[in-house]
Amino acid sequence: MIIYKDIITGDEMFSDIYKIKESENGMMLEVEGKMITRAEGDIDDALIGGNASAEVADEGCDSTSVSGVDIVLNHKLQETSYDKKSYTAYIKDYMKAVKAKLQESAPNRVDPFMANAPAEVKKILGNIKNFQFFTGESMNPDGMIGLLDFREDGVTPYMIFFKDGLEIEKC
């Protein structure tokens, strides 16, 4: 399995269990998810082991169900909010941080990143009202923000991430 992590915070953003598509210019990764509902807090008897007593009533435990996009739930992404002005301020600082990381780790990616990033940011800002914003589990404001939107069918969620802001870890 391959896990994609934020190069700034080290937060897990997504893995290769999803359908991943690279943008035409190679700047963005589009990750397709699904809407899911899962029970939380429910303990499966098979995990406990032993036999359930027939004499004593099972006290059980409270369980709740959580619904959302599988990418967000599985990787513990945290929702945050931005408007056009605040996202513009964030993305300027983020681009500088990614550029600095690229200069250390992949100097050959700096020029393509700086050349293509403004066009991607312009696309994002033009569509900003449709996006939901998610940080990694640490909620570090300097880290990557994943952008969640839905396809034209209104049902299929997908997230967009800057490819150069991710590091790949094989498990």
UniProtKB/Swiss-Prot annotation:
Subcellular location as annotated: Cytoplasm
SUPFAM superfamilies attached to this UniProt entry: Mss4-like
PROSITE patterns, per the entry: TCTP_1, TCTP_2, TCTP_3
Keyword terms, alphabetized: Calcium, Cytoplasm
Main subcellular location of this protein, as a coarse class: cytoplasm
Domain of life: Eukaryota
Gene Ontology cellular-component terms listed: cytoplasm
Signal peptide: none
Family in the record: Belongs to the TCTP family.
Protein name in the entry: Translationally-controlled tumor protein homolog
Organism (species): Danio rerio (Zebrafish)
